[in-house]
Amino acid sequence: MVVRRRKKSRKLRGRTRTMSWGRIGQHRKSGSKGGYGAAGLGKHEWTWTIKYAPTWYGKKGFNPPRIRAGLEVTTINVGQLDEIAALLEAQGKAEKEDGKIVVNLEKLGIHKLLGEGRVARPLKVITPLASELAIKKIEEAGGEVIVTRATREEAEES
């Protein structure tokens, strides 16, 4: 036969201040639970941390610095530009002026001209940024580079 017992919570209703939790305050807040949330992960809950969350502490990965937040700098080498210059002219994205193919990299969405590769034809390149080697190679081939964004030295002088 099933023994009918009253539940402890019903039995203690209205009887005592602590409802069998011992001293007043033992059942308050989170003192008996080891703290709220992630409290104690490096102290009294360390065994839990190393078992279930081993990567909780320490650094991981690498965030490369950006020139400006949110700006991805797209680049092109002078060798690549020399290869596609005639194609850009045929598509109408570049024009010919004084025997030079004029390419505006800013309009093409390219931010910087770099110096890898060879330049076989004279080019006139308009770009926000360019490396010294890129400028040197284009000028040696009989072209010119117009840098639209001022360098730090130029900005400090003016």
Swiss-Prot record:
The keyword Ribonucleoprotein applies. PROSITE patterns: RIBOSOMAL_L15. Gene3D superfamilies: 3.100.10.10, 4.10.990.10. Coiled coil: none annotated. GO terms for biological process: translation. Keywords: Ribonucleoprotein, Ribosomal protein, RNA-binding, rRNA-binding. One of its GO terms (molecular function) is structural constituent of ribosome. One of its GO terms (cellular component) is cytosolic large ribosomal subunit. Belongs to the universal ribosomal protein uL15 family. Binds to the 23S rRNA. Part of the 50S ribosomal subunit. This is Large ribosomal subunit protein uL15. It comes from Aeropyrum pernix (strain ATCC 700893 / DSM 11879 / JCM 9820 / NBRC 100138 / K1). The gene is rpl15.
